[in-house]
């Protein structure tokens, strides 16, 4: 059947051009977005506000690793067979001149968000802060970013991550993602660790004057060195 064929052939696609129906492989799309995002992050110079000498670090102060990680995980959920069935059917309809459905009804952003949120739990409260930040970016990368909490004090992100109906095929998606991209979970963990350090600098960058001094004094309470 179609699902077995997609798995066997690794025929995962991200999208296609409507003028000539050329498909773009999902792994190609992810790598291109990751590369562009990393390049954008590399241009963010946090040293303009934060003194690296004060932070006892000689590392480059950019968001390169953070945005690289977000780019890598943003379409994690498109490895869902549900999404692949939809996009392959849309490609067929386009070739046959049939009107597009336009909306898949599949929440592909939640998959990568769940992955990074779960991973962040291994790194204590500070890792969780960064994990929740990145999970929001990944989960809502098509827009609609909500407040951190609603009027009832609930987190829209956590409610979305805990909705099992959205993630019934999560394990299958994770296996397909790592197999197709030929990367390891250890590689993602290394990116995450570097992201934690970058976000630490970003937090300090947002502080000025006496507020910045207080932030630096209490830095150990927020981010580990």
Predicted regions and their residues:
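Accessory nucleic-acid engagement/destabilization modules that flank
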Residues: 5-6, 10-20, 26-225
């Amino acid at each position: 059947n179609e699902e077995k064929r997609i798995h066997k052939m690794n025929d995962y696609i991200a999208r296609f051009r409507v003028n000539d129906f050329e498909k773009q492989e999902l792994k190609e799309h992810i790598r291109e977005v990751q590369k562009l995002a990393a390049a954008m992050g590399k241009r963010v110079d946090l040293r303009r506000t934060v003194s690296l000498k004060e932070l006892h670090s000689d590392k480059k102060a950019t968001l390169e690793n953070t945005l690289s990680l977000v780019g890598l995980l943003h379409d994690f959920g498109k490895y869902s067979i549900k999404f692949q069935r939809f996009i392959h059917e849309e490609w067929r309809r386009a070739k046959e001149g049939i009107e597009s459905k336009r909306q898949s009804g599949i929440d592909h952003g939640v998959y990568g968000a769940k992955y990074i949120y779960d991973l962040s739990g291994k790194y204590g409260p500070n890792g969780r802060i960064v994990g929740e930040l990145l999970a929001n970016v990944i989960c809502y990368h098509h827009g609609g970013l909500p407040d951190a909490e609603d009027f009832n004090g609930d987190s829209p992100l956590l409610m979305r991550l805990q909705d099992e109906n959205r993630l019934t095929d999560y394990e299958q998606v994770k296996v397909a993602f790592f197999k197709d991209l030929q990367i390891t979970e250890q590689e993602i963990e290394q990116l995450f660790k570097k992201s934690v350090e970058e976000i630490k600098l970003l937090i300090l960058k947002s502080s000025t004057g006496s507020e910045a001094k207080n932030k630096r004094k209490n830095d150990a309470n927020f981010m580990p060195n």
